[in-house]
Regions:
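Short beta-strand to alpha-helix junction loop
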Residues: 61-67, 97-119, 248-254
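Flavin (FAD/FMN) cofactor-binding core of flavoprotein oxidoreductases
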Residues: 262-298
Length: 328
């Protein structure tokens, strides 16, 4: 069998899907350059840090069911960047609190949720603070343009996008009708996230809670997770439908509404220092979900959690599977 030719590949987006894809492509002998609009890799596997506090403000934990991803999680645990999290979990629904009957095995990054992403990224070529805003395919090569730096000098054999569906759509709509159609189905919703830092311990009978039919969908004590230090902080996620409906609210108004709901649930943040983050694209998945997309003729691919059922595991697998197919 003929060995695949080593390629020079551009990968836009350095969240878990992009990092997983890049790591696998590098293992297969390809040269990969990642372009990430944020200051650092991780995407929604992110952790905010203050002088004396930390808070996971994106993905709160993850699970592992697929054998390939279980192997990756085992490696992360061996490298001490992931640990089991066994919280006391409650559920609030119809004005009542009950214990959660979930049997899920939950994992978190240590000392923050971004730790596994940083581990994946450590040997990769990542251009941070680079928003790719234009693409051109000419003479079998991909040409990229960055909003911050202008034309990218490297000409790429292959272009892979590991970004939310709506962002991918803006780049591929004039290039590939099939990719455009998939990106249009991404159905992604935003998420308002509030972080509250307290001087003193908060007395609540749980570490985290699923909240149903309220503005808020999740509250979590960050210090309940392993290897967290500093002052007590809680992460509060608004539910996806409310977040999407009010995605253009001012941060002040979103904070006010979320704090009112938190107080009703028993988490009074009147004495807390609070900040809020708007995730414009936080959740959602294409239906049907093809796991990844690759146009072999155009040398254009898509990966991400939104192509593979959501979740951290879905993102990692999407990137890994795309890399294997690029190589085939």
């Amino acid at each position: 069998m003929t060995k695949p030719t080593n390629k020079t590949i551009a990968l836009i987006g350095a969240g878990i899907a992009g990092l997983s894809c890049a790591v696998r492509l590098k293992e297969l002998g390809h040269h990969v350059e990642l372009f990430e609009k944020g200051r650092s890799p991780a995407g929604r596997m992110s952790t905010k840090r203050g002088e004396d506090w930390t808070a996971d403000h994106g993905a709160q934990y993850f699970t592992a069911r697929d054998p390939l991803f279980i192997q990756q999680v085992d490696k992360w645990m061996a490298d001490q960047v992931v640990a089991l999290w066994k919280p006391t979990l409650k559920v609030f629904e119809a004005h009542q609190w009950t214990a959660s009957n979930s049997k899920d095995v939950r994992y978190v990054g240590i000392p923050g949720m971004n730790a596994p992403a940083k581990q994946l990224a450590k040997d990769l070529t990542i251009h941070a603070g680079q928003t790719i805003d234009a693409l051109k395919h000419q003479a079998g090569k991909w040409f990229l343009h960055s909003a911050e730096s202008g034309d990218i000098a490297t000409r790429f054999d292959e272009l892979l996008l590991a970004i939310p569906g709506p962002q991918a759509l803006s780049l591929v709509r004039e290039l590939d009708p099939a990719a455009k159609a998939i990106a249009e189905r991404s159905n992604m919703k935003g998420c308002w996230t509030l972080m509250a830092r307290f001087k003193d311990k908060v007395d609540l009978p749980f570490d985290a809670a699923f909240i149903n039919q309220e503005t808020i969908s999740w509250i979590c004590k960050n210090l309940s997770k392993p290897k967290r230090t500093g002052k007590e902080s809680w992460t509060i996620h608004a539910n996806a439908e409310w977040s999407q409906e009010f995605i253009e609210l001012s941060k002040e108004d979103a904070t006010e509404k979320m704090l009112a709901c938190a107080k009703k649930l028993g988490l009074d943040c009147a004495e807390a220092e609070v900040s809020v983050h708007r995730w414009r694209y936080a959740s959602g998945t294409a239906s049907p979900a093809p796991a990844f997309y690759l146009n072999h003729e155009l040398k254009l691919g898509l990966c991400g959690d939104w192509l593979n059922g959501g979740r951290v595991e879905g993102a990692w697998l999407s990137g890994h599977l795309l890399a294997n197919n690029v190589n085939s």
